[in-house]
């Protein structure tokens, strides 16, 4: 139907029209031609201009580097939006461009697009390039330009930094054609001392009336769960404190948000779950209400020290306590895939255990019956004899840690003695020691290695402590990375001592490994401890003078961290 092919460089290259009569597709321009080839003779130097102002920018990889890169970027990423009828007839919409996002309004009359423009940057990724967000008719006639912003090269290095002006534009799922977007109230600087950091705005078609403020958020806007005129849920998050707010709003009465809950979003035990969403008649995601319309359904992972036991519950629109309708029971890990009726009494779940491969089940909540729908077999029965259990152990300062211990099939500790052991880990930063110390038993999960998994070493006689907790904690205004090495040493020492004490690991044959930031961890443990004979540092960055404007979860610049600047 599209001879030139789809262009998936920016993601999924098609979307259905709400009435399912046609597709909107991002296609390769028909006249694209061959890719540009660089000449053997340089045409000139690479020139970068300074605007005469200081600007910190994180270190990124795989950036554009010269005019040839720019030409290749244009060649491969430029696309043409096309409307394709079920008959196969195709009609172009608007002009070709670097269209990073596109979506059709629920009534099928308008098209929201986000496209990149020149000049490009050699220091920043494409998401910071000059951007135009606009609304057109479904035939491509421009109706409204929401924003046409320049290169975002003046943002603070903080994670919650945001561009000035409209961003994160979307359609309201439960209205015919209402444009929704967020704007920073703090100039894009999350450190600004303001009561509200973002405002969420709405504007209904034909986009001539002034926008209205749906809600102002205490932290940086994250997402919205749409319902109807009377209820929607706006979520924001603040990285520095790991705080999340969930606000109840009534789109028909904008500006009257009320707080449903405030929580630490790293808190596994206190995770209330997320609203159940379904596709409405227009194919847009909306929350699922109870029949009396007094609550919405929510699902969550149900993390506890004894294990994760997913649940289905209802959350009153007025807030307050949830009502649990169903939760998984040992020895299973069973997630809710879909609700099969309006009352939450008939559900489709995906059930697994340490020994049983995941399969789908239709479950009667009230009656308790479970009818298998699929019968998928163990994809790697050679690993069926591998034993796995969650072990818990204390750090030197008393913090509870945990990890998943895997032992080879047929292994007997008394008969075979201690094994060479690999710790495969990844550090995580926390602002609350109680949250960092949460342990969740993984014994009800079905685990089989695939790809380049380190778990394949089980076939070679290794014991593996997978994902041993490596928390790096900064409480009370302190920065976690100020004690990174010390806490890393404590975490590793506790893990090694734990597996040696169990009699399954040989202290003289310990190895450590990790990917990316786990590779950085590996290098530090090899340099600062004598716990390990070898390490696997896979795809890491190790020289922090090459990432002076922040890395991973570190928001400070190198100079702020090494010589703190007075507040």
Predicted segments with their positions:
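Conserved acidic residues
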Residues: 21, 420, 533
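Beta-propeller folds
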Residues: 1-385, 400, 437-438
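Active-site-proximal cap/loop segments of hydrolase catalytic domains
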Residues: 424, 428, 434, 438-567
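Short beta-strands and strand-coil junctions in structured, solvent-facing domains, enriched
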Residues: 9-10, 188, 411-413, 431
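Conserved beta-strand scaffold positions in the cores of enzyme catalytic domains, especially
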Residues: 90, 257, 390, 464-466
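Conserved hydrophobic/aromatic pocket- or pore-lining residues that grip, position, or stack substrates
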Residues: 133, 179, 260, 360, ...
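N-terminal cap/lid segment of alpha/beta-hydrolase-fold proteins
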Residues: 374-417
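C-terminal substrate/ligand-recognition segments
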Residues: 239, 288-289, 298, 302-306, ...
